[in-house]
């Protein structure tokens, strides 16, 4: 009984391999089918994916502002061995005073 089931599975696998080789060997018909497949993937997978991502961003933006964590002056963070070459030398290039603390703490506190 196990041998019969094994031969059925092998027959199905062999048949699917034959169908796959036929699809891969088709020349001119493959280009039209490929274009149709990519068009369908664009409309039914990519565009709904973009829509779901937009909805996620919209819902997250209306969720509310989170409180920032309390500043803890760890000795291994925000080490300044020499000043930055711009501004006052203490702010990074893309410094945000509401999010990025200086070595002494947040600026707007």
Curated annotation (Swiss-Prot):
One Gene Ontology biological process: mitochondrial electron transport, cytochrome c to oxygen
Keywords: Membrane, Mitochondrion, Mitochondrion inner membrane, Oxidoreductase, Transit peptide, Transmembrane, Transmembrane helix
Residues exposed to the Mitochondrial matrix side: 25-34
TM helices/strands, residue ranges: 35-59
Pathway stated in the Swiss-Prot or TrEMBL entry: Energy metabolism; oxidative phosphorylation
UniProt keyword Transit peptide present: yes
Membrane topology: Single-pass membrane protein
Transit peptide recorded as keyword: yes
Mitochondrial intermembrane side: 60-109
Role: Component of the cytochrome c oxidase, the last enzyme in the mitochondrial electron transport chain which drives oxidative phosphorylation. The respiratory chain contains 3 multisubunit complexes succinate dehydrogenase (complex II, CII), ubiquinol-cytochrome c oxidoreductase (cytochrome b-c1 complex, complex III, CIII) and cytochrome c oxidase (complex IV, CIV), that cooperate to transfer electrons derived from NADH and succinate to molecular oxygen, creating an electrochemical gradient over the inner membrane that drives transmembrane transport and the ATP synthase.
Name the record gives this protein: Cytochrome c oxidase subunit 6A1, mitochondrial
Lineage: Eukaryota, Metazoa, Chordata, Craniata, Vertebrata
């Amino acid at each position: 009984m196990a041998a019969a089931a094994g031969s059925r599975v092998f027959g199905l696998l062999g048949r699917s391999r034959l169908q796959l080789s036929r699809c891969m060997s088709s020349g001119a018909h493959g280009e039209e089918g490929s274009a149709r497949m990519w068009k369908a993937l664009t409309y039914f997978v990519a565009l709904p994916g973009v829509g779901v991502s937009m909805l996620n961003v919209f819902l997250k933006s209306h969720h509310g502002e989170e409180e920032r964590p309390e500043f803890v002056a760890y000795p291994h963070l925000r080490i300044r061995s020499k000043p930055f070459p711009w501004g006052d030398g203490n702010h990074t290039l893309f410094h945000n005073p509401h999010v990025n603390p200086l070595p002494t703490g947040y600026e707007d506190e």
